[in-house]
């Protein structure tokens, strides 16, 4: 008997779901949200039970990887229990989480016990003052303590996510890489996404391509092409000097990954986003609440939604905003 498969109209298999569990965050990163962000009222967001119901239907339809995001997922009460329930779904191979690391000093061990398989931790600077400037509120030492707690809890292939911005942190690329090597962490360098209207910097001036990052790395290390994949947008390389870790590049501008896109996103409001860089979406919250106890209705809505998944985004790295919603509203 063949496994169920979600397929879009371009014959791309969709088996990876990113689920935002909150739009709230204890940081205010300059590329992610406005400093005076207004968050959604509680009645407007999905309950944990509703999030679980969506996860159940996606896994039944062939999803093999789920990533929980935010906002900062670990500020949502009850998220560890949600992880335990999602991790237990038959057929799911990976339950991952993207976090800023601020809560990991106390939650890394419970997350590992709950069945979370991998963590991505955002880290854009190793300079405490610059880290505070980029996050507006973050404490670098607390995040590093969280990274160490993740290693101590038993997580492997923990990955650092670094958004590289010209003139802000591009000079730290190799220092971040050395930090990753020292702690046996993977790392992905990310081109800034043009989501939301920001005021801290000009995206046209701060754009730093993946090719430029590789050139900077080559000043200190030897990059070796790799066929590694985590079923996400990162294209991986290895280092001759540290072959045990993976170096990823997420390049929505310079080398977009649309042709092999295998993922969709669920916002905390219950909108199923079919593309990070477009507004094509389906309101799954409305389906859930109009049809309690009828999972087949939700399943049909998910299957039908695949037919409006676009071929690609239209990101550019000028100061034009392609998508008005901020990253924390999208699911980072």
Swiss-Prot record:
GO biological process terms held by the UniProt record: Mo-molybdopterin cofactor biosynthetic process
Ranges for domain Radical SAM core: 9-220
Keywords of this entry: 4Fe-4S, GTP-binding, Iron, Iron-sulfur, Lyase, Metal-binding, Molybdenum cofactor biosynthesis, Nucleotide-binding, S-adenosyl-L-methionine
UniProt: S-adenosyl-L-methionine binding residues: 31, 71, 122, 193
Essential cofactor(s): [4Fe-4S] cluster
UniProt binding sites for GTP: 18, 67, 98, 159, 263-265
Annotated TM spans: none
PROSITE patterns: MOAA_NIFB_PQQE (PS01305), RADICAL_SAM (PS51918)
Lineage top rank: taxon: Bacteria
Entry keyword Transcription regulation: no
Gene Ontology MF terms: 4 iron, 4 sulfur cluster binding; cyclic pyranopterin monophosphate synthase activity; GTP 3',8'-cyclase activity; GTP binding; metal ion binding; S-adenosyl-L-methionine binding
Reaction(s) the record says it catalyses: GTP + AH2 + S-adenosyl-L-methionine = (8S)-3',8-cyclo-7,8-dihydroguanosine 5'-triphosphate + 5'-deoxyadenosine + L-methionine + A + H(+)
Record-listed [4Fe-4S] cluster 2 binding positions: 258, 261, 275
Alphabetical list of Pfam families matching this protein: Fer4_12, Mob_synth_C, Radical_SAM
Pathway: Cofactor biosynthesis; molybdopterin biosynthesis
UniProt cofactor note: Binds 2 [4Fe-4S] clusters. Binds 1 [4Fe-4S] cluster coordinated with 3 cysteines and an exchangeable S-adenosyl-L-methionine and 1 [4Fe-4S] cluster coordinated with 3 cysteines and the GTP-derived substrate.
Keyword Transcription regulation carried by entry: no
Family as reported in the entry's similarity comment: Belongs to the radical SAM superfamily. MoaA family.
PANTHER family: MOLYBDENUM COFACTOR BIOSYNTHESIS PROTEIN 1, MOLYBDOPTERIN COFACTOR SYNTHESIS PROTEIN A
Assembly: Monomer and homodimer.
Function text: Catalyzes the cyclization of GTP to (8S)-3',8-cyclo-7,8-dihydroguanosine 5'-triphosphate.
Protein name (Swiss-Prot/TrEMBL): GTP 3',8-cyclase
Species assigned in the record: Pseudomonas savastanoi pv. phaseolicola (strain 1448A / Race 6)
Lineage, highest ranks first: Bacteria, Pseudomonadati, Pseudomonadota, Gammaproteobacteria, Pseudomonadales
Gene (name only): moaA
């Amino acid at each position: 008997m063949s496994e169920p498969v979600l397929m879009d109209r371009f014959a791309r298999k969709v088996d990876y779901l990113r689920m935002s569990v909150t739009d709230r965050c204890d940081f205010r990163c300059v590329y992610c949200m406005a400093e005076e962000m207004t968050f959604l009222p509680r009645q407007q967001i999905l309950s944990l039970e509703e999030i679980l119901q969506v996860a159940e239907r996606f896994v039944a339809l062939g999803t093999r990887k789920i990533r929980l995001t935010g906002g900062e997922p670990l500020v949502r009460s009850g998220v560890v229990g949600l992880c335990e329930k999602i991790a237990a779904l038959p057929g799911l191979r990976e339950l991952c989480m993207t976090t800023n690391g601020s809560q990991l000093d106390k939650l890394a061990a419970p997350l590992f016990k709950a069945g979370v398989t991998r963590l991505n931790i955002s880290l854009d600077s190793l300079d405490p003052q610059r880290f505070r400037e980029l996050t507006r509120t973050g404490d670098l030492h607390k995040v590093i303590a969280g990274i160490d707690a993740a290693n101590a809890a038993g997580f492997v292939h923990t990955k650092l996510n670094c958004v590289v911005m010209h003139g802000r942190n591009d000079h730290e690329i190799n220092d971040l890489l050395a930090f990753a090597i020292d702690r046996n962490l993977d790392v992905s360098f990310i081109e800034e996404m043009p989501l939301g209207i920001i005021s801290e910097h000009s995206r046209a001036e701060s754009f730093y391509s993946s090719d430029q990052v590789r050139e900077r790395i080559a000043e200190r290390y030897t990059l070796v092409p790799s066929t590694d994949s985590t079923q996400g947008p990162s294209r991986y390389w290895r280092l001759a000097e540290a072959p045990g870790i993976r170096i990823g590049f997420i390049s929505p501008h310079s080398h977009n990954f649309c042709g092999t896109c295998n993922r969709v996103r669920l916002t905390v409001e219950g909108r199923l986003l079919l593309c990070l860089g477009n507004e094509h979406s389906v309101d799954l919250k409305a389906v859930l609440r109009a049809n309690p106890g009828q999972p087949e209705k939700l399943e049909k809505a998910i299957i039908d939604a695949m037919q409006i998944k676009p071929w690609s985004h239209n990101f550019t790295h000028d100061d034009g905003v392609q998508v008005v919603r901020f990253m924390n509203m999208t699911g980072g």
